[in-house]
Amino acid sequence: MITERLQKLRESMKNKGISAYIIPSADFHQSEYVGDYFKCRQFISGFTGSAGTVVVTLEEAGLWTDGRYFIQAEEQLKDSTIKLFKMGEQGVETVEQYLNRVLKDGDTLAFDGRVLNAKEGYGYEKEYSDKNINIVYEYDLIDELWADRPSMSKDKAFLLDVKYAGESIQDKLTKVRAIMKKQNATMHILNSLYDIAWLLNIRGNDINNTPVVLSTAVITLDKVYYFVDEEKLNDEIKAEFNKIGIEVRNYFEIYDFVKTIQKDEVVLLDGTTVNYKLYRNIPSNVSIIDAPNPTFIFKAIKNEVELKNIRECHIKDGVAMTKFMYWLKTNIGKIKITEISASDKLEQLRRSDKDCFDLSFPTISGYKEHAAMMHYSATKESEYELEQEEMLLVDSGGQYYTGTTDITRTYILGDITEEQKLHYTSVLRGMIRLSKAKFLYGCRGLNLDILARGPLWDLGIDYKCGTGHGIGFVSNVHEGPNGFRWKIVPERNDSCILEEGMVTTNEPGVYIEGSHGIRIENELICQRGPKVGLDQFMEFETITFAPIDLDGVNPEYMDKSEIVWLNNYHKEVFDKISPYLNEDEVEWLKQYTRAI
């Protein structure tokens, strides 16, 4: 099927004189996860991961993806003729290096300019400006092949009440306009769905598990133009927007609107989130400031109301996770449980709380060697039945009106080897070491990542991903500019100074291909610690509360401070979660939060 699609794509390319065609993962807004309409890269390659770029030439094809997906991509591409390029690995060509090698004098490089960001687009422009290589950005060639392509979402939007958001739309606009004035901008084009959701306190269902609305906002110093499918807006939204001067326009009208921008305007935009076609439609005599959206940092630093809500929703999430662990541990070997039925049970427990309206991403439920694929997705064909042996990794989260959660636990279902216990305990040690870090203000995740990775590096083991990511508020489960990783990855934009109020995950892991995978993940709020003289120290507050499976822990591998932290953490889990459990669950929880 994939080879047939590639053949048809190449026929179309030949007819149009195209030598190479780029198919990224993004939608028109550079979203990480996308709606079904935008899954062109998945359609042409069969690779289902959330990140990757396909390049097709008339002779060959390649997929570039990151370390989270190496194992999965190898499996999904094996019969496709598409070559896997492992991004970030030594000696592996980047997309740009590959194109420079294969494109010849007179060739044409093409892509849909709506799904490539402006920075990438003008990067290609600059690269090939002095070479005889043409760039065409008006072709959506996949649309021609995809006969039963899903339509764009028509789901309704809703306003997020200020009791959850903590700030009014007007107050947020005032903050954005203050930054615009500082930068001498008269207009700001905001194309990131997550930033628009934060700024306008609007949420929707246009991307599975990510409550955003397909839209673009243009902010001037006294007005806002909001480009959206108006059918998605209810009367409450229209009334609120009308009251504060937000003018609603057709979603696709933005491309013509920007053509009319006057030359005396100074436009602020972020070239990594504005798409290339939108950027190219702005008249060339208009001054452009290409800089991060002001909302990028505003939404990352949670306000006091958001933090209060986030803490509350993590208790609810912890109750669901604890009930799930009880169900799993007491039923394994007694009833049939599969990777999918376990995932379904957890979703049922989460959604039993009326505050939970969705998952924050498709649950990763990986048993045995499946857990070595960081973002494994079980299917009816691939799923395993769980037995009283080995380990089950479950990475999951919920969308609550009070916040977004992300938690991973690895459960011991029976006998495991001493090596697996060493791996499990080392992952736990790394998670603990980062959790209890004290550091000077000015540190970035780059400075702290080794705390989590250190126990594994001591064993000669690494994991091919960051240690943690920022997390949105009733928004995308992955959010910058905060994160933990050991080296700078510019396109991730997640290595900022850690500020008070930022929420970041802490999730070291071990992934042994063909054998097992282990990950333990909590969320952390960055907060001020003591000030000593002129030195402001910072620390983390752990906000995730669910038992860590002690059946995988060998205390002999831990130092005293790590054991003290774990015992204190489990006492807090019991104190916070037990009031919401039945009698049997409470008795069971005593055993799984015992001091070691």
Predicted feature residues:
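Active-site neighborhoods and metal-handling regions in enzymes and metal-associated proteins
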Residues: 1-596
